[in-house]
Amino acid sequence: MPEAVQELRRTHEDEAQGLAVALEAMGKLDDFTLAYIACALWCSNDDSTPSGGDPLERKYSIADIAPETLRKMVNDCTAFQRANEALLGASGLGAELAGHDFWLTRNRHGSGFWDEDIGDVGRKLSETASSCGECNLYIGDDRRIYGI
């Protein structure tokens, strides 16, 4: 399992982590969702400098994600997986890579489903991921991570 996914599984003592643990216990934080969250923290910056700052993963973890944002991330991942179950299965990507690609594709990064060499399946997954709209993370005044 990638190190970033393992990092997200570590236990922390706060409300967001408590929610994450509860969701995982209910089977909602699967490898797709954990990889999606890991990718979000990896490729979103904290805006701590004029040039964008550091990737969130350097100073923040799933424990810092506001509960409402974490719920939305989980719901988005669950809905995407349900709506695209056949395509995801046909892609052969595996849950972790697919979760990673879902974040990248929906946010129009330079990589994603379309460059996985899976032909029409990649194109269709790209279309559905893009139709979910972008989700940008930011640090609130309370030092929690929020999504817009």
Language model features with spans:
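Amphipathic protein-protein interaction modules
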Residues: 74-141
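Long, contiguous N-terminal structural blocks used for assembly/anchoring
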Residues: 2-90
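Long, highly charged low-complexity segments enriched in Glu/Asp and Lys/Arg with interspersed Ser/Thr
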Residues: 140-148
